[in-house]
Amino acid sequence: MSYMPAQNRTMSHNNQYNPPDLPPMVSAKEQTLMWQQNSYLGDSGIHSGAVTQVPSLSGKEDEEMEGDPLMFDLDTGFPQNFTQDQVDDMNQQLSQTRSQRVRAAMFPETLEEGIEIPSTQFDPQQPTAVQRLSEPSQMLKHAVVNLINYQDDAELATRAIPELIKLLNDEDQVVVSQAAMMVHQLSKKEASRHAIMNSPQMVAALVRAISNSNDLESTKAAVGTLHNLSHHRQGLLAIFKSGGIPALVKLLSSPVESVLFYAITTLHNLLLHQDGSKMAVRLAGGLQKMVTLLQRNNVKFLAIVTDCLQILAYGNQESKLIILASGGPNELVRIMRSYDYEKLLWTTSRVLKVLSVCSSNKPAIVDAGGMQALAMHLGNMSPRLVQNCLWTLRNLSDAATKVEGLEALLQSLVQVLGSTDVNVVTCAAGILSNLTCNNQRNKATVCQVGGVDALVRTIINAGDREEITEPAVCALRHLTSRHVDSELAQNAVRLNYGLSVIVKLLHPPSRWPLIKAVIGLIRNLALCPANHAPLREHGAIHHLVRLLMRAFQDTERQRSSIATTGSQQPSAYADGVRMEEIVEGTVGALHILARESHNRALIRQQSVIPIFVRLLFNEIENIQRVAAGVLCELAADKEGAEIIEQEGATGPLTDLLHSRNEGVATYAAAVLFRMSEDKPQDYKKRLSIELTNSLLREDNNIWANADLGMGPDLQDMLGPEEAYEGLYGQGPPSVHSSHGGRAFHQQGYDTLPIDSMQGLEISSPVGGGGAGGAPGNGGAVGGASGGGGNIGAIPPSGAPTSPYSMDMDVGEIDAGALNFDLDAMPTPPNDNNNLAAWYDTDC
């Protein structure tokens, strides 16, 4: 048919299309179909159910319709070139070759070559039903074939195993070698492999073969078979029960690479999956042989060896010591320096991480250059390698505080603080805390590379994650004291808006280890006068006083308990922190803050002076020293001096004049001197004599005296600067990750331990010879009323001369000439570490 012209289409009054004139004798259905083939293919949808659409206004056919076969004239069909006989012949041919088509699809290998089979596929992209069934049928065929072969292999191996066992036990090495190779070939197939591992006699024969044979080929074949068996749990158990581990360990000395590979991989599989293998390898001397193998240079082989070492050393102190005695740390560090194969570096770092918690291995790793070698990989793209290196560095860092040449590591750690990984930041902060402890060069380096800014940001971002805030605060505490850039660090904390965040850490829910670290940091920050006002405004003084009162109450409660129950518990602990440490820290921080007049007024308002006075009676000399120090600052104001005197401080202060602790005696003298400013002249004169007799003692060279004239208990208190002590168990522990049961160290807070008479200007109107001073025998100076008290006798002129004495005539001293210059800061002695701890604010 042809398209009908548009003008021939007429519209009736009922708004329906009238079909064009059609030839007679055409059914209604055919008329409808032909009507659909008009020039626009418009369809009301009534007859066909198609969606109604408006003909295109452009008069063009839709693009989608142009390629549709239905668009062609209905008269266009298959060419009528076949006769009925030909059609019948084709149908018969297709019917006769149906089985061949099925065979070609499912079993193509059964067809003879050259046979042509007519295809029923008209569209190459549309497979026939037979073709669609061919893939699963092929899979089924292969499964059946494999099952048949598996059964054949299993039967063959089962029949051959008894004979092969006899051959393996033969005395002729050639026979043994041939039998071992046959067994090795059988072990490559799964069915026969299961048959071998199910025969304990066969496995035992293989173990004997590798133990007794001197033939390399038979050894290689036998150990290769054991290697194949070790991929199955049943095979591992068979090897273990047959005593295969000692034989495999013996092969670790073989000069043949393939034998070594088979032996180490089999042992590795045993260590991973077979219970009891670790002890068996240790008893067979496997650790020593594996450490020796670390000298090889095949990275994949080394990766397996190091993983074996990690498995053996983890949780076993004896294994760690064996690795140390065999020279393991040096070889492991060499590997970290020499290779870039990620898996090898990762497995080696795991071994070092395990060894780094061993107090014996730790210094050996550090001495071998482990810190620098691990630092080389902090920029690696492998997160697991970086994490292991950081964990290991954290464990080693407390033993590396004196190591030189860590500038690159410190810079990398500061950069790592910006990571979004909590574990990475935790480790980096802990390492920085330890490496900046008692190391002025490291402190300066961290400050110069922006460490203070990074640590403040870390604390701000950490929120309530104490596993991050505690080491970060400790690191800041180290950076803000006792090095050339400490003042810059103190200012940098303020300029980076860190003061408010740090003070907030004194609030609950912070735990005592963190609070202790924050107290020390605030004390150091207070050394910068510019920080006094901001600290006060953020409530630092209020929180310090609150913590002091709580800790003081706990210590007093503990004392009462000891007195009433006879308990032997010497002090109160909270989260591993002694409350005496909190008392000393808070009082020391208030001492430095009290240098500013507004802070002194606020401290007086807190009604805390009575506690300071009571602390003068404390048996711990460091607490006596900080208490006397804060009273010395508060006594600078008349109001403070009056309150101190009203609280009865004169008596204990006078007693402390005779303390063997130079700092305590000097502060006590300074407080008494300031309290006497409005006293009568007679009182001042007696006080000056008492002070002179007390300060000019027979201890001529106390700074150079090794024991400082103190008992061993006090010298233990004046211990060196502590490294960061991690509180939480996340990550591998270091020596400093435990709080329980450690001795109480009297950390110094740098509270102006003034040399006796240093900065004490004493003038005399009468010139005279130098007078030494032995402690006077007199009693205390009078109390608030300025009354009695025996004045110490004037020492004889022949007494030894104190190095701190001035040229004076003691009998003619003008008390008004006494002037304590409390701003004078003596230099810590370089030859006395115990005494230098007074100046140690890092702990």
From Swiss-Prot:
- Write down the InterPro entries for this protein, in alphabetical order: ARM-like, ARM-type_fold, Armadillo, Beta-catenin
Keywords attached to this entry: Cell adhesion, Cell junction, Cell membrane, Cytoplasm, Developmental protein, Membrane, Phosphoprotein, Repeat, Segmentation polarity protein, Wnt signaling pathway
Q: What biological-process GO terms show up in the record?
A: branch fusion, open tracheal system; branching morphogenesis of an epithelial tube; canonical Wnt signaling pathway; cell adhesion; cell elongation involved in imaginal disc-derived wing morphogenesis; cell fate determination; cell morphogenesis; cell-cell adhesion
| Principal subcellular localization | cytoplasm
Which GO terms of the molecular function aspect are on file? Answer: alpha-catenin binding; cadherin binding; DNA-binding transcription factor binding; kinase binding; nuclear receptor binding; protein phosphatase binding; transcription coactivator activity
Q: Where does the record say this protein resides?
A: Cytoplasm; Cell membrane; Cell junction, Adherens junction
How does the UniProt record describe the way this protein sits in the membrane? Peripheral membrane protein
Q: Where are the ARM repeats?
A: 159-200, 201-242, 243-284, 285-326, 327-368, 369-410, 411-449, 450-496, 497-538, 539-584, 585-608, 609-647, 648-689
Naming one, the record's GO cellular component terms include:
germline ring canal
Q: Which domain of life is it from?
A: Eukaryota
Per the record, residues carrying Phosphoserine are S688, S694
Pfam families per the UniProt record, alphabetical: Arm
Post-translational events = Phosphorylated on Ser, Thr and Tyr residues. Level of phosphorylation varies both during embryonic development and from embryonic tissue to tissue. Sgg is required for phosphorylation and wg signal negatively regulates arm phosphorylation. Hypophosphorylated form of arm increases in steady-state levels. Phosphorylated directly or indirectly by CkIalpha which stimulates its degradation.
| Tissues expressing the protein | Isoform cytoplasmic accumulates at low levels in axons, at high levels in specific cells along the CNS midline and in leg and eye imaginal disks. Isoform neural accumulates in the axon tracts of the CNS. Both isoforms accumulate in the peripheral nervous system.
Q: Which residues carry this modification: Phosphothreonine?
A: T650
Family under the similarity heading: Belongs to the beta-catenin family.
Physiological role: Isoform neural may associate with CadN and participate in the transmission of developmental information. Can associate with alpha-catenin. Isoform cytoplasmic accumulates through wg signaling; arm function in wg signal transduction is required early in development for determination of neuroblast fate. Arm and Abl proteins function cooperatively at adherens junctions in both the CNS and epidermis.
- Record text on subunit structure and interactions: Interacts with Mer and Moe at the adherens junction. Interacts with Inx2. Interacts with alpha-Cat. Interacts with Myo31DF.
Under what name is this protein listed?
Armadillo segment polarity protein
